[in-house]
Protein backbone atom coordinates (compact mmCIF):
# COMPACT_ATOMS: atom_id res chain seq x y z
CA UNK A 1 0.00 0.00 0.00
CA UNK A 2 2.84 2.40 0.75
CA UNK A 3 4.43 1.62 -2.60
CA UNK A 4 1.12 2.36 -4.31
CA UNK A 5 0.89 5.59 -2.35
CA UNK A 6 4.39 6.66 -3.44
CA UNK A 7 3.59 5.76 -7.06
CA UNK A 8 0.42 7.83 -6.90
CA UNK A 9 2.39 10.75 -5.45
CA UNK A 10 4.90 10.60 -8.30
CA UNK A 11 2.02 10.48 -10.79
CA UNK A 12 0.44 13.49 -9.07
CA UNK A 13 3.71 15.40 -9.35
CA UNK A 14 3.75 14.57 -13.05
CA UNK A 15 0.14 15.53 -13.72
CA UNK A 16 0.28 18.70 -11.62
CA UNK A 17 2.67 20.25 -14.17
CA UNK A 18 1.83 23.67 -15.67
CA UNK A 19 0.12 21.93 -18.62
CA UNK A 20 -2.01 19.70 -16.39
CA UNK A 21 -5.18 21.03 -18.05
CA UNK A 22 -4.08 19.86 -21.49
CA UNK A 23 -2.91 16.50 -20.14
CA UNK A 24 -6.17 16.08 -18.25
CA UNK A 25 -8.14 16.99 -21.35
CA UNK A 26 -6.34 14.38 -23.41
CA UNK A 27 -6.80 11.69 -20.77
CA UNK A 28 -10.29 12.47 -19.52
CA UNK A 29 -12.00 13.72 -22.66
CA UNK A 30 -13.60 16.95 -23.74
CA UNK A 31 -16.43 16.78 -21.21
CA UNK A 32 -14.03 16.58 -18.27
CA UNK A 33 -11.92 19.38 -19.73
CA UNK A 34 -15.02 21.56 -20.00
CA UNK A 35 -15.86 20.67 -16.42
CA UNK A 36 -12.36 21.69 -15.37
CA UNK A 37 -12.64 24.95 -17.30
CA UNK A 38 -15.75 26.26 -15.56
CA UNK A 39 -15.39 24.05 -12.48
CA UNK A 40 -14.84 26.98 -10.14
CA UNK A 41 -18.40 28.12 -10.85
CA UNK A 42 -19.93 24.67 -10.33
CA UNK A 43 -17.60 23.60 -7.52
CA UNK A 44 -20.24 23.87 -4.80
CA UNK A 45 -22.83 21.92 -6.81
CA UNK A 46 -20.73 19.09 -8.26
CA UNK A 47 -18.20 18.79 -5.40
CA UNK A 48 -20.00 19.06 -2.05
CA UNK A 49 -17.73 20.05 0.81
CA UNK A 50 -15.28 21.92 -1.41
CA UNK A 51 -17.03 25.26 -1.67
CA UNK A 52 -14.00 27.55 -1.53
CA UNK A 53 -11.96 27.61 -4.72
CA UNK A 54 -8.73 27.77 -2.71
CA UNK A 55 -9.32 24.32 -1.20
CA UNK A 56 -11.19 23.06 -4.26
CA UNK A 57 -8.54 23.51 -6.97
CA UNK A 58 -5.85 21.18 -5.53
CA UNK A 59 -8.49 18.55 -4.79
CA UNK A 60 -9.80 18.75 -8.33
CA UNK A 61 -6.27 18.48 -9.71
CA UNK A 62 -5.72 15.40 -7.54
CA UNK A 63 -8.91 13.80 -8.84
CA UNK A 64 -7.99 14.46 -12.45
CA UNK A 65 -4.48 13.11 -11.90
CA UNK A 66 -5.74 9.97 -10.18
CA UNK A 67 -8.28 9.24 -12.91
CA UNK A 68 -5.74 10.02 -15.61
CA UNK A 69 -3.13 7.69 -14.23
CA UNK A 70 -5.55 4.86 -13.68
CA UNK A 71 -7.02 5.18 -17.17
CA UNK A 72 -3.63 5.33 -18.97
CA UNK A 73 -1.17 3.25 -16.93
Swiss-Prot record:
Residues 39-73 are annotated as: Disordered. Binds 1 zinc ion per subunit. Belongs to the peptidase M1 family. Its main location: cytoplasm. It comes from Streptomyces lividans. Residues 42-51, 61-73 have a biased composition (Low complexity). This is Aminopeptidase G. Keywords: Aminopeptidase, Cytoplasm, Hydrolase, Metalloprotease, Protease, Zinc. It is found in: Cytoplasm. The keyword Manganese does not apply. It is an enzyme of class 3 (hydrolase). Its EC number is 3.4.11.-. Its cofactor is Zn(2+). One of its GO terms (molecular function) is metallopeptidase activity. GO terms for biological process: proteolysis. Hydrolyzes preferentially the N-terminal glycine and can also hydrolyze other amino acids which are used by PepN but is unable to hydrolyze basic amino acids. One of its GO terms (cellular component) is cytoplasm.
Amino acid sequence: LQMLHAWTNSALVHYAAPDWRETGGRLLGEGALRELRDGRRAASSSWPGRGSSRRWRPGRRTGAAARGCWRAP
